[in-house]
Every structure is written in C-alpha cells, then in structure tokens.
Regions:
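Predominantly flavin-linked oxidoreductase catalytic cores and closely associated redox partners
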Residues: 11, 21, 25, 102-164
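Nucleotide donor/acceptor-binding cores
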Residues: 4, 29-31, 123-124
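Beta1/beta-strand and adjacent pyrophosphate-binding region of the FAD-binding site
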Residues: 1-14, 34
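Glycine-rich nucleotide phosphate-binding loop and flanking beta-alpha elements
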Residues: 15, 42, 132-134
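N-terminal FAD cofactor-binding segment of flavoenzymes
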Residues: 17, 21-76, 94, 144, ...
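Anionic group-transfer/hydrolysis microenvironments
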Residues: 7, 39, 129-130
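A conserved beta-strand/loop capping segment in the N-terminal third of enzymes
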Residues: 50-113, 119
C-alpha cells in the first residue's frame, strides 16, 4: 500500500475545500495527498447557500448574491437589508471544476474510489464523511429548494425569501 502524508476521506465540499486550501497555500509542495471519494465524476449536483461573513476563495463560483432578504412566517413577512453580510449561492459544478482543475496540476495528489484499508501510521487523516446515524440531540440544518423557470417576470430576484412562502 502506498503511503501518503495526508489522506482526506470524502471529496465533497469540505474535503475538496481542505485539499484546495492546502494546495493554494503551498502546503503540498513536498507532500503527498490521497483523496478518497466514491463518485466516478464531479457534476453539478448541489447549490450551497450561506451568509458571507468572511472573505472566501470562491467568489468566481457564486451564481447569485443578495443584500435584501425577507423572513416569512405564518404570521407575515419582514423585509431586511444587509450591506456587510450578503447571502450567496455557489453552484457545485463551478466549484468542482475550479478545485479539480487546480488539484489536477499537482502530481502528488491522487484520487481513489475504492479503498478497503488505510494505514494510518504515517499520515494525517481528515474525515469529512458525516456519521451514518445522526445523534438526535444534535442540530442538523438543511434547506431544500427548487429552481423554477417562468415565462413572465413574477419574482424579484433582488430579494431572497427565507421561510415558508405565503400563497
């Protein structure tokens, strides 16, 4: 079994961002990295949305950014504005392409799909794979949304609506 200085288990958003940060900060110049990820190819499969509270290296992957938002509840909605913490959405397809293009230039980085055993004696191991059973006492935040296309402009794309829509 080949030894690696670093092993990242899980090549999704977290694992790839760690690999990318190591690469762009020149931490892999004389080190080897194995990324263990079962998927055969990276394709657009998600959209990640978040409040931008710190600068990040993925502004070129942002597909939309909002400074105006509305919080909707059963009792009504409240429109708010933020100048310093925009709400942003990143397209996973752009994200995967950017990171994999960068990582593919370093011959010390290898991707593996099927690994049955890992020798952990001489490696730093980073595991970004969530537990298969979630502890019910922990908070799990997950939003589900849909992208729709309409024939007429009926939405204000300058404001993000958070919460249940009022019909």
């Amino acid at each position: 079994m080949k030894e690696f200085d670093y092993v990242i288990i899980g090549g999704g958003c977290a694992g790839l961002s760690l690999a990318y940060e190591l690469e762009i900060n020149n931490k892999l110049e004389s080190k080897t990295l194995a990324i263990i990820e079962p998927r055969a190819e990276y394709k657009r499969d998600k959209t990640w949305s978040f409040w931008k509270v710190v600068d990040h290296n993925f502004d070129d992957c942002v597909i939309k950014s909002w400074n105006n938002f509305s919080i909707n509840t059963p009792s009504g909605s409240n429109e708010l504005k933020t100048e310093i913490f925009p709400y942003q959405s990143i397209d996973s397809g752009h994200y995967y392409k950017k990171i994999n293009t960068s990582l593919s230039k370093n011959k010390n980085i290898k991707f593996f799909k099927n690994i049955d055993e890992i020798d952990t004696n001489n490696s730093f191991i980073f595991n970004s794979v969530p537990e298969s059973t979630l502890d019910k006492s922990k908070i799990w935040q997950h939003f589900q949304g849909v992208e729709i296309e309409v024939e007429k402009d009926i939405f204000d794309d300058e404001i993000i609506k958070i919460g249940r829509a009022h019909v």
